[in-house]
Amino acid sequence: MDSTYCFSHKHIFGIEQMSTEDIVHILDTAQSFKEISERSIKKVPTLRGKTVVNLFLEPSTRTRLSFEVAGKRLSADTFNISGSTSSTTKGETLVDTARNIEAMRPDAIVLRHSSSGAAQILAKHIDASIINAGDGTHEHPSQALLDMMTVRDNFGSIKGLIITIIGDIAHSRVALSDIIGFTKMGATVRLAGPATFIPMGIEAMGVEVYSSVAEAVQDANVVMALRIQKERQNDPLIPSLREYSICYGVNKKLLERAADDVIIMHPGPVNRGVELNPDVADGKGSVILDQVTNGVAVRMALLYLVAGGNRNGEEQGV
């Protein structure tokens, strides 16, 4: 990387805003933080005195917990607000909620919201750094970064790999962020799924679209399955889950077409027997739990980079 490079983003809205250098810098930073999670005492004073608010106005388990763990391991004061406990349930707008939080002078707000672009709207009204933890069907940058970290851990480099994503592409913010990220890093991205799950014109993003799952996984280095986002669909877009599993579920027979060293990924939650057979989810090549582990490291890196942590010297413990 250029020795003059400097990470200059105050906010993390999406992978689209990032350069290749930004992505590499985040992944390298996350790699240095990953070692902390292997220690007997999993804590460093990097963000001591900093305040992080996790504002999750849409249901989440993995992402919310991952950001909370990340903040605590960096010694930040972390506070969690969910949709059910926020004043938005009483009619308060997102901006008013954020302004009230801002009055308490947090250093960073991690936001999950059902509306695309919510993080950008928030950033126009408050001074704290905003990290997008998922906004509608727009982006989920930290998930894409942990996915890229997991792939890089397994192959050393992302460039030249074939990444096959199967499932509900149209309603998945993970898919969009992964497409942008892996493409920027030099991978070939293939998409497969029912026609109702593939956005029209998505080929313009530089991806290859397949109607045949078997062809999509041919020689693939990475096979990523996505769940059906029923909460974002007004009407059912497939005949049944059983038929979906038969036609698009990832099983051992299908993976015989992939590269010998193929890895299996899923952003979670996994619907076993639908998008992934249990023997695949738990079998050789599955790196689903590695994704979870890397998620903490990536989110530590993001919090450090936007909240102004100090990592100079041995005393910082990194």
Swiss-Prot record:
UniProt binding sites for carbamoyl phosphate: R62, T63, R112, H140, Q143, G268, P269
Catalytic activity line of the entry: carbamoyl phosphate + L-aspartate = N-carbamoyl-L-aspartate + phosphate + H(+)
> Which PROSITE patterns does this UniProt record tie to the protein?
CARBAMOYLTRANSFERASE (PS00097)
Among InterPro entries, the record links this protein to: Asp/Orn_carbamoyltranf_P-bd (IPR006132), Asp/Orn_carbamoylTrfase (IPR006130), Asp/Orn_carbamoylTrfase_sf (IPR036901), Asp_carbamoyltransf (IPR002082), Asp_carbamoyltransf_Asp/Orn-bd (IPR006131)
Q: What role does it play? A: Catalyzes the condensation of carbamoyl phosphate and aspartate to form carbamoyl aspartate and inorganic phosphate, the committed step in the de novo pyrimidine nucleotide biosynthesis pathway.
Family membership, please give it.
Belongs to the aspartate/ornithine carbamoyltransferase superfamily. ATCase family.
Q: What is this protein called?
A: Aspartate carbamoyltransferase catalytic subunit
Origin species: Desulfotalea psychrophila (strain LSv54 / DSM 12343)
What taxonomic classification does the UniProt entry list for its organism?
Bacteria, Pseudomonadati, Thermodesulfobacteriota, Desulfobulbia, Desulfobulbales
